[in-house]
């Protein structure tokens, strides 16, 4: 039987939520009630599958750990009052930490004036952010399209490349194996994981995948496309594959891809949604090889962990296809004043505090510690790898990876797996993580591995 809508129920639920939002703290009974409510509502109204995922990466299969608030700049607090060092970083959102005061202040100040733009008048912060990104990004990148997420930024990049290359008779895209570019129809066509692709087949035509890091495979694909008349519009790739398991290409790979794109007249799209904004020790990962893309995709950390925002930045030559009709690709909330305020403040913090350099220093410290643990526990750990504050620990099998996440949860350190590689746990903390917290994370990882070895020996 169809359920009738209930205004009274909706009003009561929204009022209850607003009451919780107003509260800074909860007593013990309120915490227990909130946990029960959240679990029930996820099961009945969000997606019960998320409960099982959360259960797999928390201590003892307890999915009752409900996030309540940020603790310090680099920590989270649940409804039980337990504080966790955040080594997940919202999958790369919190580069400048949780509730960074500079970012929060900028958003609050803008909120007091104008939260959203009229859609008709010129909005100043969008212009200022576009100018800032033109100055910050490498090469001839000049014009920015703003959206709300990484997937949207990739979608815009693909459409922009199509609009530019279609008059030239170039319609094919080359992506790489193991890559993750998002889950909208266009972005999913570039994504390489069958689990996400199969339910939505057929996807957009014209996408090919080649092994990541293999420059000869890239050259072969470009040559084959040219011979068959399927000329390549663009090559799209991540400088370091995040969801693929923090996979680093061989040195010089990006430079070689750039040369091939120039040789075959293909655009180079770099998806820096996860690697950008200082994460790898440079503001953008492509700067490690001084590579200049034609189109650059940003999101995640661009909003400072306070507002969602994505950006697609392109050269004037490429972006000019939108000049005659700027409404060819738009979004209602993209580039709104609150999001732009957050992004401008985030960039300011990254530069003022030199956080990319800090990411390199602290990332080296963490990675040295994880590699030492890999040497101490070769029966459990296959490899520790990474660049800057984007790291991964790969285990010998999937189950060990899940157990490690649970043990780290017991040690009050939050980590999680990657979408495309179940054996790999990603370490992606805020760039603001302190040296003392870095040391605590390494100690927690050592305790977790020691406990896991005992469990294996007793089994």
Curated annotation (Swiss-Prot):
GO terms for biological process: L-lysine catabolic process; putrescine catabolic process. Pyridoxal 5'-phosphate binds at residues 150-151, 274, 332. InterPro entries: Aminotrans_3 (IPR005814), Aminotrans_3_PPA_site (IPR049704), Class-III_PLP-dep_AT (IPR050103), Putrescine_aminotransferase (IPR017747), PyrdxlP-dep_Trfase (IPR015424), PyrdxlP-dep_Trfase_major (IPR015421), PyrdxlP-dep_Trfase_small (IPR015422). Pathway: Amine and polyamine degradation; putrescine degradation; 4-aminobutanal from putrescine (transaminase route): step 1/1. It is an enzyme of class 2 (transferase). GO terms for molecular function: diamine transaminase activity; identical protein binding; putrescine--2-oxoglutarate transaminase activity; pyridoxal phosphate binding. PROSITE patterns: AA_TRANSFER_CLASS_3. Its EC number is 2.6.1.82, 2.6.1.29. Its cofactor is pyridoxal 5'-phosphate. Gene3D superfamilies: Aspartate Aminotransferase, domain 1, Type I PLP-dependent aspartate aminotransferase-like (Major domain). Keywords: Aminotransferase, Pyridoxal phosphate, Transferase. It catalyses: an alkane-alpha,omega-diamine + 2-oxoglutarate = an omega-aminoaldehyde + L-glutamate; putrescine + 2-oxoglutarate = 1-pyrroline + L-glutamate + H2O; cadaverine + 2-oxoglutarate = 5-aminopentanal + L-glutamate. Pfam families: Aminotran_3. The modification N6-(pyridoxal phosphate)lysine is found at residue 300. Belongs to the class-III pyridoxal-phosphate-dependent aminotransferase family. Putrescine aminotransferase subfamily. Catalyzes the aminotransferase reaction from putrescine to 2-oxoglutarate, leading to glutamate and 4-aminobutanal, which spontaneously cyclizes to form 1-pyrroline. This is the first step in one of two pathways for putrescine degradation, where putrescine is converted into 4-aminobutanoate (gamma-aminobutyrate or GABA) via 4-aminobutanal. Also functions as a cadaverine transaminase in a a L-lysine degradation pathway to succinate that proceeds via cadaverine, glutarate and L-2-hydroxyglutarate. HAMAP family: Putres_aminotrans_3 (MF_01276). This is Putrescine aminotransferase. It comes from Shigella flexneri. The gene is patA.
């Amino acid at each position: 039987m169809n359920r009738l809508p209930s205004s009274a129920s909706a009003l009561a639920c929204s009022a209850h939520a607003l009451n919780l939002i107003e509260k800074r703290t909860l007593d013990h009974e309120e915490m227990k009630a909130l946990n029960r409510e959240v679990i029930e509502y996820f099961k009945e109204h969000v997606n019960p599958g998320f409960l099982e995922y959360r259960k797999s990466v928390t201590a003892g299969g307890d999915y009752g750990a409900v996030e309540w608030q940020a603790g310090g700049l680099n920590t989270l607090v649940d409804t039980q009052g337990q504080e966790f060092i955040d080594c997940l970083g919202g999958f790369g959102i919190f580069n400048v930490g949780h509730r960074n005061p500079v970012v929060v202040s900028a958003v609050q100040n803008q909120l007091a004036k104008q939260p959203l733009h009229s859609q008709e008048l010129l909005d100043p912060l969008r212009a200022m952010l576009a100018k800032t990104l033109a100055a910050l990004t490498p090469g001839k990148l000049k014009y920015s399209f703003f959206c709300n997420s990484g997937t949207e930024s990739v979608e815009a990049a693909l459409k922009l490349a199509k609009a530019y290359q279609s008059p030239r008779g170039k319609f094919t895209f080359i992506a790489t194996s193991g890559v993750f570019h998002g889950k909208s129809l266009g972005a999913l066509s570039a994504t390489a994981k069958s689990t996400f692709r199969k339910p939505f087949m057929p996807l957009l035509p014209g996408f090919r995948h080649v092994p990541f890091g293999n420059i000869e495979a890239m050259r072969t694909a470009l040559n084959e496309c040219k011979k068959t008349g399927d000329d390549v519009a663009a090559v799209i790739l991540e400088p370091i594959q995040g969801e693929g398991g923090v996979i680093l290409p061989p040195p010089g790979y990006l430079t070689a891809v750039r040369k091939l794109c120039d040789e075959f007249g293909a655009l180079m799209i770099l998806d820096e949604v996860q690697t950008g904004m200082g994460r790898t020790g440079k503001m953008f990962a492509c700067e490690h090889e001084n590579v200049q893309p034609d189109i650059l995709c940003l999101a995640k950390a661009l909003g400072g962990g306070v507002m969602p925002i994505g950006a697609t930045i392109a050269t004037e030559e490429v972006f000019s296809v939108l000049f005659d009709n700027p409404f060819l690709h738009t979004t209602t909330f993209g580039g709104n004043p609150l999001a732009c305020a957050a992004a401008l403040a985030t960039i300011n913090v990254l530069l003022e505090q030199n956080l990319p350099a800090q990411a390199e220093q602290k990332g080296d410290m963490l990675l040295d510690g994880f590699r030492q643990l890999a040497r101490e526990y070769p029966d459990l750990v296959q490899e520790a790898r990474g660049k800057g504050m984007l790291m991964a620990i790969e285990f010998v099998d999937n189950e060990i990876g899940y157990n490690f996440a649970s043990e780290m949860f017991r040690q009050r350190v939050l980590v999680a797996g990657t979408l495309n590689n179940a054996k790999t746990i990603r370490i992606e903390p805020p760039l603001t993580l302190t040296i003392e917290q870095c040391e605590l994370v390494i100690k927690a990882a050592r305790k977790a591995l020691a406990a896991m070895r005992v469990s294996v020996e007793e089994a």
